[in-house]
Amino acid sequence: MTDKKKTSNKKKMTGKFKIVNKLGLHTRPAAKFVKAALLFQSDVTLAKDDIVANGKSIMGILMLAAEKGSTVTLTVTGPDEAQAFETLKKIIQNGFDE
């Protein structure tokens, strides 16, 4: 009997983006980001410096303390990653519509 291990062929989409809105990633833009991330099945992370946050957790996003001008790294992995990545990328690049 042989034991077959399934190997994970997970792909991921990742990109670095500058926070451009005046007040940075505070409660309102964090809520907008999380609300959009929750629409997708894919795993979403947002990172700044050495801190990696679950992109579907408002508390995690707020812990990044991403001020205007800081760079965040968006990573999306999962079945709808391309659509999720594009949606979340636009939200960041548009300054969270603030």
Q: How does the language model describe each region?
A:
Residues T2-D3, T7, E86-T87:
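Long, contiguous binding/interaction regions
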Residues T7-N9, L64:
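Generic marker of residues within folded, mature protein domains
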Residues K10-K16, T71-T73:
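Intrinsic-disorder/low-complexity, polar/charged segments enriched in Ser/Thr/Lys/Arg/Asp/Glu/Gln
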Residues E67-E98:
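C-terminal structural segments of small proteins and small subunits
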Residues T14, K18-V20, I91:
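Residue-level signal for pocket-adjacent positions within structured domains
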